[in-house]
Amino acid sequence: MASCGEVDHSVSSLPSSKKGSGDSACSGSSGSSPALPVPECAICLQSCVHPVQLPCRHVFCFLCVKGASWQSKRCALCRQEVPEDFLEHPTLLSPEELKTGGRGATGDNAWYYEGRNGWWQYDERTSRELEDAFSKGKKTAEMLIAGFLYVADLENMVQYRRNEHGRRRKIKRDVVDIPKKGVAGLRLDTEGGVQGSAAAGRGNSADGADTSAAAVQQAAAAPAATTVLSAPARPPTSLGGQPGSPTSPSLEDTLALLHISPTDAPERAEVGEGEEEATATPSMSSSPNTYADGSGDWSDDEGDGEAVEPREQRLRLGESLVDRSPPGAEASSSSSVRSRRPDGQCTEV
């Protein structure tokens, strides 16, 4: 390999005409900045289209970076993390080239794909491929966009992914200077410069199509609204098996439902084991289920505190309820009424 001295020596040995041309080229490069060579994209292995520079200073196509971001928010070369808002505010190496390509020459044709509330223009490379296939009379053309293979149906003027035919998007061929949203997912904002299509709060597909932020928020809020609406709204069940008020029933209301005077309130707390075991248990069995669901508002003195009273109160309560039975129902109730003896066994009265 030649050293630097040898290279300098070989250059100095050139004819004066050659040296003059070289000097003029150097002076021209110092006086005006020539067009930089288009860098190669390490993702698509082609020359970059709308090249963007990541914070790690690696350069890729904008759509290639967008397609890679669906897998991970990291650089494809050094694996350094890419900022979350990079696709919204990309660092373009040649923003003027994007604007020039978006305007084009009057009368030139360009290809567009349908977005939400407008049309997006394909990038220059894809437009050339579509125009070439269209001029040759081909029915379909394949395109590599953001790492995905798309098929353009030039007869029906739709595009779709090659492995997913269900989702179709309209395409069209029109003049280049029609109103449009942007080029290849990059918005042409005349006031604030060029922005990514996600800058307006949009979720973007791989090919640069957009979805409005309102639709995304509504879709995200729909499950929450459904969950709120689907909450059980049944009224709380009272101890007597009848619907109560939305608030916790008072002790007097509960006693009134059972036809017990307030003076017998201390004895009421133990209904369920003695006299009412055969009749009131079915209605009481639904109360624990209702309480477990959390749909009823139960006070502390009406739920779990029924099994802590002395046995004497249970006996007195059973006897008082037997005495208060209706006169006409003595014969029928005597066979079904039970009481608990001190030995813990239930016997018929």
UniProtKB/Swiss-Prot annotation:
SMART domains the record matches: RING, WWE
Xref: InterPro entries: RING-HC_RNF146, RNF146, WWE-dom_subgr, WWE_dom, WWE_dom_sf, Znf_RING, Znf_RING/FYVE/PHD, Znf_RING_CS
Keyword Glycoprotein carried by entry: no
Enzyme class: transferase
Domain of life: Eukaryota
Polar residues bias: start-end ranges: 283-292
WWE domain location: 97-173
UniProt-recorded Gene Ontology molecular function terms: poly-ADP-D-ribose binding; ubiquitin protein ligase activity; ubiquitin-protein transferase activity; zinc ion binding
Keywords, alphabetical: Cytoplasm, Metal-binding, Nucleus, Transferase, Ubl conjugation pathway, Wnt signaling pathway, Zinc, Zinc-finger
Regions of compositional bias (Low complexity) in chain numbering: 10-21
Chain intervals annotated as zinc finger (RING-type): 41-79
Chief localization: cytoplasm
Sequence positions that bind a glycoprotein: Y113, R116, W120, Y150, Q159, R169, K181
Compartment(s) of residence: Cytoplasm, Cytosol; Nucleus
Gene3D superfamilies registered for this protein in UniProt: 3.30.720.50, Zinc/RING finger domain, C3HC4 (zinc finger)
Pfam families according to UniProt: WWE, zf-C3HC4_3
Region (Disordered): 1-21, 226-251, 264-349
Ranges of biased composition (kind: Basic and acidic residues): 308-317
Functional description taken from the UniProt entry: E3 ubiquitin-protein ligase that specifically binds poly-ADP-ribosylated proteins and mediates their ubiquitination and subsequent degradation. May regulate many important biological processes, such as cell survival and DNA damage response. Acts as an activator of the Wnt signaling pathway by mediating the ubiquitination of poly-ADP-ribosylated proteins. Neuroprotective protein. Protects against cell death induced by DNA damaging agents and rescues cells from G1 arrest. Promotes cell survival after gamma-irradiation. Facilitates DNA repair.
The name this protein goes by in its record: E3 ubiquitin-protein ligase rnf146
Biological source species: Salmo salar
